[in-house]
Amino acid sequence: MRPDDINPRTGLVVALVSVFLVFGFMFTVSGMKGETLGNIPLLAIGPAICLPGIAAIALARKTEGCTKWPENELLWVRKLPCFRKPKDKEVVELLRTPSDLESGKGSSDELAKKAGLRGKPSLQGQGELPMASSITTPTPMEEGECQSPGQSGRREETSRYLDGYCPSGSSLTYSALDAKCSAWDRSEHPEPEDSIFFVPQDSIIVCSYKQNSPYDRYCCYINQSQGRWDHETIV
């Protein structure tokens, strides 16, 4: 913005319209004296030339050089159907999902529908579907207390397969839908700082923590339904 508070684009509009303003003012003054152009009085021609130029300058001032819509004026134009932008309901729901998860609003079924997990079966013997709003990497003590006995077979097979790639004692595996500890268990063990959001359903999380590693820590997500346990390398 210039020191005189005039947008350069607005100044360009004034320069282009100044010709119409000058001739419109001259015709208006001549028409007030009774002069005519043939049978047409100049008093009718002058305002017809001058008023559009004044309107163009006013519009350029309101829109900051025709770069944006005015804030308070021309509200009726925005309400026209041609100016309305359709909003995708799915995008709106996905945008609202993180705030709902952080604030705790909405039931587990509603959050499952928003995350696209409505058609997948839930675990047996659990009243609610635990969402991955605050799934954290457990310590070895928490892992022993929060294990689900119904998935021992698949877990043991996966653990044996991963033993060849991860040193013993450096990896922790658990399902994303395991039951969490109760309230009195959480008070004894503080929650880790890092949290993982929207973990895929029925997936295995492998986290490695090495003291001398330059990469500090990393986690891998493995889908049990899509994994083949013959000749694969998991990075």
From Swiss-Prot:
<dbReference type="Pfam" id="PF15746">
    <property type="entry name" value="TMEM215"/>
</dbReference>
<feature type="transmembrane region" description="Helical">
    <location>
        <begin position="40"/>
        <end position="60"/>
    </location>
</feature>
<protein>
    <recommendedName>
        <fullName>Transmembrane protein 215</fullName>
    </recommendedName>
</protein>
<feature type="transmembrane region" description="Helical">
    <location>
        <begin position="12"/>
        <end position="32"/>
    </location>
</feature>
<dbReference type="GO" id="GO:0016020">
    <property type="term" value="C:membrane"/>
</dbReference>
<feature type="region of interest" description="Disordered">
    <location>
        <begin position="99"/>
        <end position="158"/>
    </location>
</feature>
<keyword id="KW-0812">Transmembrane</keyword>
<keyword id="KW-1133">Transmembrane helix</keyword>
<dbReference type="InterPro" id="IPR031486">
    <property type="entry name" value="TMEM215"/>
</dbReference>
<keyword id="KW-0472">Membrane</keyword>
